Amino acid sequence: MKSYMARPGEVERKWYVIDAEGKTLGRLAAEISRLLRGKNKPQYTPHVDVGDFVVVVNADKVEVTGRKAEQKVYRWHTGYPGGLRERSYRQMLRKRPEEILRQAVRGMMPKTRLARRQLKKLRIYAGPEHPHAGQTPEPYEVR
């Protein structure tokens, strides 16, 4: 008996909507990365994109444990000399709450071309509304 290998044309994708309100950042990001990669499906194949689309709402209400709210710092470099920038978790939550969750999910994905393509199937919104009602996303409960 041969092993099953999924082909890109025969993959059936679903849309899931996840409410991030009151969820822990890391646990939520781990579950989202599993869905994006397709590891929840029996036809998972490492070199084929078999993952689903994920819509996250209420990203501004995600929680962190311990003292991360005061101590966590996001750093990046602009590419110019002296261009190291940093923002605290609280500043990021105020200015760009979607980016907190996007960076957490990105850190849990492999650093490959396939993972970058899979990350494009992630849609994050700060509030409770999203424009993807036409795709009829199923609610997905994160444990």
From Swiss-Prot:
Any Gene Ontology biological process: negative regulation of translation
A Gene Ontology cellular-component term: cytosolic large ribosomal subunit
Keywords in alphabetical order: Ribonucleoprotein, Ribosomal protein
A molecular function (GO) term: mRNA binding
Coiled coil: none
Keyword Coiled coil: no
The keyword Ribonucleoprotein belongs to this UniProt entry's keyword annotation: yes
Highest taxon in the source lineage: Bacteria
Protein task: This protein is one of the early assembly proteins of the 50S ribosomal subunit, although it is not seen to bind rRNA by itself. It is important during the early stages of 50S assembly.
Protein family membership: Belongs to the universal ribosomal protein uL13 family.
Subunit (UniProt): Part of the 50S ribosomal subunit.
PANTHER family assigned to the protein according to its UniProt record, in alphabetical order: LARGE RIBOSOMAL SUBUNIT PROTEIN UL13M, RIBOSOMAL PROTEIN L13
Protein name, entry field: Large ribosomal subunit protein uL13
Source organism phylogeny: Bacteria, Bacillati, Actinomycetota, Rubrobacteria, Rubrobacterales
